[in-house]
UniProtKB/Swiss-Prot annotation:
It is found in: Secreted. Its main location: secreted. The modification Valine amide is found at V107. The lineage of its organism: Eukaryota, Metazoa, Ecdysozoa, Arthropoda, Hexapoda. The gene is CHHL. It comes from Bombyx mori. Belongs to the arthropod CHH/MIH/GIH/VIH hormone family. InterPro entries: Crust_neurhormone_CS (IPR018251), Crust_neurohorm (IPR031098), Crust_neurohorm_sf (IPR035957), Hyperglycemic (IPR001166). This is CHH-like protein. GO terms for molecular function: neuropeptide hormone activity. One of its GO terms (biological process) is circadian rhythm.
Length: 110
């Protein structure tokens, strides 16, 4: 009988650990929803790959500086704020500037 209660406690502990691990952010690919596109008031065409690339720039910038509002400020106005440009510079994306500007035009219709 004692062994059964130990096994039950162990199973409960494992279940708790698994559920806690599921609640943590993972290193899985960044999932971008169409809802985010409209929340940012982007007026262009929703393309998940392009939107994810632009969003990833803001995510990387946030990870670099760890400023709480930076991610939101970077994405504001469909990636057209000076914060987004500052993030591009901080991440040394000079050689991709034209391509990124075209992406912003595509999703944002500036």
């Amino acid at each position: 009988m004692h062994l059964s209660s130990v096994q039950f406690a162990w199973a409960a502990l494992v279940a708790l650990a698994v559920s806690a691990a599921g609640a943590l952010p993972s290193s899985a690919p960044h999932h971008v929803e169409r809802r985010s596109f409209f929340t940012l008031e982007c007026k262009g065409v929703f393309d998940a790959a392009i939107f994810a690339r632009l969003d990833r720039i803001c995510d990387d910038c946030f990870n670099l500086f760890r400023e709480p509002q930076l991610y939101t400020l970077c994405r504001a106005e469909c990636f057209t704020t000076p914060y987004f440009k500052g993030c591009m510079e901080s991440l040394y994306l000079y050689d991709e500037k034209e391509q990124i500007d075209q992406m912003i035009d595509f999703v944002g219709k500036r």
